[in-house]
Amino acid sequence: MENMFRLMDQDQDLTNNRCIWVNGPVIVGAGPSGLATAACLHEQNVPFVVLERADCIASLWQKRTYDRLKLHLPKQFCQLPKMPFPEDFPEYPTKRQFIDYLESYATRFEINPKFNECVQTARFDETSGLWRVKTVSKSESTQTEVEYICRWLVVATGENAERVMPEIDGLSEFSGEVIHACDYKSGEKFAGKKVLVVGCGNSGMEVSLDLANHFAKPSMVVRSSLHVMPREVMGKSTFELAMKMLRWFPLWLVDKILLVLSWMVLGNIEKYGLKRPEMGPMELKSVKGKTPVLDIGAIEKIRLGKINVVPGIKRFNGNKVELVNGEQLDVDSVVLATGYRSNVPYWLQENEFFAKNGFPKTVADNNGWKGRTGLYAVGFTRKGLSGASMDAVKIAQDIGSVWQLETKQPTKRSRGSLRRCISQQF
């Protein structure tokens, strides 16, 4: 509290605004990463506040994913800390099952985010040694500005906070429908239409597959090399198999084995216009964070001619698209499966821990979860949900050790006496 009074002395305007002192960390983001961190803090008896700009938890999953989506990895690699998936869930839970799991998770660990609070800025105040997090919350008729003052700030907005919209010559004048993959729900409304899917990652492949299954005519733009792996080999998860092999074999050998297995299951995909990178799939993931595509049926559709693979785009002209090889295609609709990016640079006023791309600078050193001055990041290590869970455990232990020492509380305490958040309004 001494720091709080020092902050008030040097900024008299605080008394004229709604200001909340948080007796614990502020977590920005109520997706899986933020929920995992909150749950681990709960187990450490550390109070917290979770700020979420949307009106629900896991808004990316609830509002910006397609209907057919399932987890790409087996559920044991996607569960959050302290709570496994229900035993009756399939190995690859559906979108709806994963959302149900997250909602149950939030209930179990008493996580009640402050919804519709969009963080405008967050900066560390050197004088007080505290973080100042300014938010704007909007209702139907009012707009409220709040400033949260805290000792610790956990950035949990993740790798996929904002859609990436490519700049393509003539796209703005295209006469058909253009949507980002985050607005795509089902191929049902595209039946019989010629749809150009821009992007060939997991989203691009699955959107193309879904379109083909709904009798659309998808063409998928593939500009660069990529690794496509079967999701399973002989009934076993390819990812799980890779993780087991890495315990015993060097990475280069694991990559060679995976490529042989992929060729055995999928055949030579390069003859369909899908060129593989020189770097192996696991090495590419480790070095550049580029995730291999896990095939769930798209390659078979490509082989049958149900999905057309095309090279890069040169320009749009009316309802036509000209490709870099000179070919022209008639197109009714365009789906931009061009990915997402971090939005951290837009609101976090800090450039020592985070780089301009919105990722921690120290990710490659396996220390991308902790910065200075009480700043933490969860879910930025490009290791999926399992990586976010590992970050969450480390962050909670780091903050919890300081909290327990300073408050001299026992590690465990009855749930009934646990205080989620101690706040004072000024």
Curated annotation (Swiss-Prot):
Pathway: Plant hormone metabolism; auxin biosynthesis
Catalysed transformations (reactions): indole-3-pyruvate + NADPH + O2 + H(+) = (indol-3-yl)acetate + CO2 + NADP(+) + H2O
Record-linked Gene3D superfamilies: FAD/NAD(P)-binding domain (3.50.50.60)
Induction: Up-regulated by high temperature via activation by PIF4. Positively regulated by STY1 and during the day by REV1.
KW Transport (keyword) present: no
Residues annotated to bind FAD: 29-34
Cofactor or coenzyme needed: FAD
Superkingdom of origin organism: Eukaryota
GO biological process, one term: regulation of auxin biosynthetic process
Keyword Oxidoreductase: yes
GO-annotated molecular function: flavin adenine dinucleotide binding; indole-3-pyruvate monooxygenase activity; N,N-dimethylaniline monooxygenase activity; NADP binding
Keywords: Auxin biosynthesis, FAD, Flavoprotein, Monooxygenase, NADP, Oxidoreductase
EC number, UniProt record: 1.14.13.168
Free-text tissue specificity from the UniProt record: Expressed in root tips and in hydathodes. Expressed in root vasculature and quiescent center, but not in the meristematic zone of the root tip.
Binding annotation for NADP(+): 199-204
UniProt cross-references to SUPFAM superfamilies, sorted A to Z: FAD/NAD(P)-binding domain (SSF51905)
Record InterPro entries: Auxin_biosynth/cation_transpt, FAD/NAD-bd_sf, Flavin_mOase-like
EC top class named in words: oxidoreductase
Family as reported in the entry's similarity comment: Belongs to the FMO family.
Function: Involved in auxin biosynthesis. Belongs to the set of redundant YUCCA genes probably responsible for auxin biosynthesis in roots.
Stated name of the protein: Probable indole-3-pyruvate monooxygenase YUCCA8
Organism for this UniProt entry: Arabidopsis thaliana
